[in-house]
UniProtKB/Swiss-Prot annotation:
Keywords: Disulfide bond, Host cell membrane, Host membrane, Host-virus interaction, Inhibition of host complement factors by virus, Membrane, Repeat, Secreted, Signal, Sushi, Viral immunoevasion, Virion
Topology class, membrane: Peripheral membrane protein
Keyword Methyltransferase (UniProt): no
Protein name: Complement control protein C3
Cell compartment(s), UniProt: Virion membrane; Host cell membrane; Secreted
SMART domains assigned: CCP
The keyword Signal belongs to this UniProt entry's keyword annotation: yes
Disulphide bridges: C21-C70, C54-C81, C86-C126, C112-C143, C148-C190, C176-C201, C206-C248, C234-C261
Organism: Vaccinia virus (strain Copenhagen) (VACV)
PANTHER family: PROTEIN CBR-CLEC-78
Length: 263
């Protein structure tokens, strides 16, 4: 009686060892070659194998089939799937690219140099193309020079630009009509698609500069217009309070204000 019990247990143990019992797990980058997933109640014996195929975007790591083999300790996987690679991305003119990798699912970020703007998408992804080859999608963008429209017109003045568009870094020069003074920078710069602030043309006439107990030491003129400079000195016995020089400025005023001669 005791021997029969041992024999039964031994046979039962052999039966469990010979069976892996359930279907193996499926790696996320593979699929079963045959429809074993629907046979959830199937039992597999030691030595049985189940084949896998790589999902799109993946390839076999080495030659030969990919399969799991039932062993005494469970399923053992032979071979595996690894990500396919896209071709090396090409550089773009007047721009840079930040490569996050060249494997399936990786991305590239594009940016343009100063003075250029991106035409197209700023990111491309490594994907499986319609022909089965690995491609970057969407295609690489281009970096196009930022352009300014024709520079703005100003009252009582003009500029020397006659183009429809201007590239980044272009400079256009303004001048004023006769009798007007140019206030600001005569040249405007195209930068980032915008012009720097243009000057204005104004009539600037300052009154004759006179100070009590003092006199002009330089800058004698019958009339004074924008940016004319004058210098002052005091008579003997007086000393200068304030700046010794002044400039005719917008608003028909002297700046800094005229000095005084004090005892």
């Amino acid at each position: 009686m005791k021997v029969e019990s041992v024999t039964f247990l031994t046979l039962l143990g052999i039966g469990c060892v010979l069976s892996c019992c359930t279907i193996p797990s499926r790696p996320i980058n593979m699929k079963f070659k045959n429809s074993v997933e629907t046979d959830a109640n199937a039992n597999y014996n030691i030595g049985d194998t189940i084949e896998y195929l790589c999902l799109p975007g993946y390839r076999k790591q080495k030659m030969g089939p990919i399969y799991a083999k039932c062993t005494g300790t469970g399923w053992t996987l032979f071979n595996q799937c690894i990500k396919r690679r896209c071709p090396s991305p090409r550089d773009i003119d007047n721009g840079q690219l930040d490569i996050g990798g060249v494997d399936f699912g990786s991305s590239i970020t594009y940016s343009c140099n100063s003075g250029y703007h991106l035409i197209g998408e700023s990111k491309s992804y490594c994907e499986l193309g319609s022909t089965g080859s690995m491609v970057w999608n969407p295609e690489a963008p281009i970096c196009e020079s930022v352009k300014c429209q024709s520079p703005p017109s100003i009252s009582n003045g003009r500029h020397n630009g006659y183009e429809d568009f201007y590239t980044d870094g272009s400079v256009v020069t303004y001048s004023c009509n006769s009798g007007y003074s140019l206030i600001g920078n005569s040249g405007v710069l195209c930068s980032g698609g915008e012009w720097s602030d243009p000057p204005t043309c104004q009539i600037v006439k300052c009154p004759h500069p006179t100070i009590s107990n003092g006199y002009l030491s330089s800058g004698f003129k019958r009339s004074y217009s924008y940016n004319d400079n004058v210098d002052f000195k005091c008579k003997y016995g007086y000393k200068l309070s304030g700046s010794s020089s002044s400039t005719c400025s917008p608003g028909n005023t002297w700046k800094p204000e005229l000095p005084k001669c004090v005892r």
